[in-house]
Amino acid sequence: NLEFQEVIDRLYPKEYECSQKIRELIQSQYGHTVTEEEVAYLALHIKRIRME
């Protein structure tokens, strides 16, 4: 059984990679922890924006 974030990573690898970079930025600049689930949701939002 695949985890939600694994499914998103497989379906949208470019968006998932981008969201991981954003997570690194948020964590380094603001000291806020971003979960894997939040990274996956961010990837979905990035995919939606790219489709517009």
Q: Which residues does each PLM region occupy?
A:
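A cross-family "folded-core" feature that marks the main globular domain of proteins
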Residues: N1-E52
